[in-house]
Each structure stands twice: as structure tokens, then as C-alpha cells.
């Protein structure tokens, strides 16, 4: 599935991933290929991307995620 992570300043990440684990406002959750459509707010925490057997971690400071049709868009306030 395709993932984009965007902040007000720049596009932080764009690529094909196997899964993404997000810090939801009501607890963490994971999105995999063919996930049901979802829109959720994000809390401050770790966003973990898994692609080709490798993990990459970003720290997001809140935001919103939208997932539909194997496209995931993360709009984050900031990313470290």
C-alpha cells in the first residue's frame, strides 16, 4: 500500500509499505493492506513503518490519518 507522511513544512515520507503502526488518540493501531476505510486523529507518539522486512520509526506530534483503497495519508503537526 502507498503511504505519505506530510507536515505543514514538507513531505516527510512517500513510498510503498507493508504496514504502518500509528499512535491513535484512543490507543495505537496498525493499518495493513486492504484495511477498511478509516479517518482517525493521532496523538504524540511513534509511527512505525514496515517495508521489505525493515522497520523505520518516526515521532509524530499529533495529526490526522486517512486510509482508503490501499492509500494512507498522514497529516502530522510535526515529525522527528
Residues covered by each model-derived region:
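Compact, glycine-rich, soluble single-domain proteins
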Residues: 2-80
